[in-house]
């Protein structure tokens, strides 16, 4: 995600220090992002939540420029490319910390750039109709600034799509797993790891669990809705006529397995006991592979509409201006 989207950045390390996950130059991480995208698309039944709002905003225009879509934290670029195919008249820009290399399968109306979302969106202008931000919460140092930056580049009436996974697991009945100490009945290593990760991110000030309030308090957005996607971990859930839950479960098992394993070093660096974390990670691998216990991951998708309020810089933003 640097402020100049036209310059290719210097090569990043295999792991990104802020995001705490492998960069997309890693085949494993690229695959994880694609697995997650496919699973969420099946679970939602669409590329995006707020379907009516998005379709209305991205309708073809007989006059003036066609709609523009911005995908912040584009990852492998799969969402941006998919949107470019669904809306071939629109222009799509995907930006991230690692520049995605377009290939022969990339639609002509889709481009990629390099952008560090923590540095602001100044270089992107103010002419987007839809801005999509998903699964980047842990890498954003200042969530309030993120909301303000999106407001800056989004046209009045434009749609902000935000999505993020909870660092909690839910049982077969969609009830949140309780916090149980190791050795007690009902203890789940995977949930224990996620609980530790949640505590670390909260300590770092990266709270993504109340994004609705951030939107409403900004003055730049009208909150319009939320859609929750409970995705099974593993192929234990029976398919329905509308949803291939077994495929979703298989994809999310791969996704969560890679996610949890890649965060082990972060927990150790944050002061957690190395032996304990190593033991929990080993049990987590077994839990995910055997679907024991049977659990769901929860992804929240929020959408909001940009108000007519004129964007004005905060005191800090004004001080940063050249």
Report each predicted region and the residues it spans.
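A short glycine-rich, Lys/Arg-flanked "PGG" loop and its adjoining helix->strand segment in the class I
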Residues: 144-159
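Conserved catalytic/acceptor-binding region of the Class I
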Residues: 138, 162-257
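A short acidic, Gly/Pro-enriched loop at the edge of an enzyme's catalytic core
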Residues: 121-131
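Class I SAM-dependent methyltransferase SAM/SAH-binding core
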Residues: 66-122, 145
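Class I SAM-dependent methyltransferase Rossmann-like catalytic core
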Residues: 2-64
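Short N-terminal helix/helix-N-cap motif within the alpha/beta-hydrolase-1
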Residues: 140-142
């Amino acid at each position: 995600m640097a402020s100049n989207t036209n310059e290719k950045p210097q090569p990043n390390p295999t792991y990104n220090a802020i995001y705490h996950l492998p960069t997309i130059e890693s085949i494993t991480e690229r695959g994880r992002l694609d697995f997650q995208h496919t699973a969420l698309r099946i679970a939602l039944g669409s590329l995006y939540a707020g379907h009516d709002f998005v379709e209305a905003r991205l309708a073809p225009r007989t006059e003036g420029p066609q709609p523009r879509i911005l995908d912040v934290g584009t990852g492998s670029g799969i969402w941006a490319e998919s949107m470019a195919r669904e809306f071939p008249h629109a222009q799509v820009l995907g930006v991230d910390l690692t520049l995605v290399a377009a290939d022969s399968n990339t639609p002509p109306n889709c481009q990629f750039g390099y952008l560090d979302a923590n540095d602001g969106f100044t270089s992107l202008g103010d002419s987007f109709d839809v801005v999509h931000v998903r699964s980047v919460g842990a890498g954003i140092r200042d969530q309030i600034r993120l909301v303000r930056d999106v407001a800056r580049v989004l046209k009045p009436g434009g749609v902000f799509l935000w999505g993020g996974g909870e660092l909690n697991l839910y049982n077969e009945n969609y009830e949140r797993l309780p916090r149980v100490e190791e050795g007690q009945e009902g203890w789940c290593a995977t949930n224990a790891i996620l609980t530790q990760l949640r505590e670390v991110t909260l300590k770092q000030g990266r709270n993504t669990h109340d994004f609705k309030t951030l939107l409403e308090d900004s003055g730049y957005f009208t909150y319009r809705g939320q859609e929750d996607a409970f995705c099974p971990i593993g192929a234990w859930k029976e398919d329905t006529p509308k949803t291939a839950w077994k495929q979703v479960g298989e994809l999310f098992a791969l996704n969560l397995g890679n996610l949890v394993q890649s965060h082990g070093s972060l927990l150790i660096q944050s002061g957690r006991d190395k032996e304990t974390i190593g033991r929990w990670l080993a049990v987590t691998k077994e839990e995910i592979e055997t679907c024991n216990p049977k659990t769901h991951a929860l992804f929240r998708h929020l959408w909001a509409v940009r108000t007519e309020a004129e964007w004005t810089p905060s005191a800090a933003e004004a001080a940063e201006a050249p």
